[in-house]
């Protein structure tokens, strides 16, 4: 893979660990990986590389608030690496986050560091498929910088319609006619 930018948010070891972690998480049901926080594209390239190695049908959707002034961009690194399974979308981060968490099988969050509890609750309420969430905790980056959580959809019991109450005549007894013969 050709990461063209000199800026590295993750050490080479952490980036390799992220790629291997995601590669191990991808299974036959994985269709979308959501990355929140593109920045310079280092994690984007690793996620797309893991998806590309494991399955041609897995897409990486990378969202961020704005295009940081890093040059070369994530798109340029992806193109140089011949990886085309990724879309990078910018702007309206909160709206896009809510929209895409429903579709993602794997979510990598490298943003919202101060609001992660709030975002995890949003994920738990809205996922419709089992989803693995990887959160990069910059405070923990000396050790293992990733926290992994598996979230399953909340199955809510359906409200059943009660049939309308009608009087039934189950207790009716049929009167027998008896004839007395008189002589």
What are the residue ranges of the model-derived segments?
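S-adenosylmethionine/decaboxylated-SAM
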Residues: 3-4, 12-154
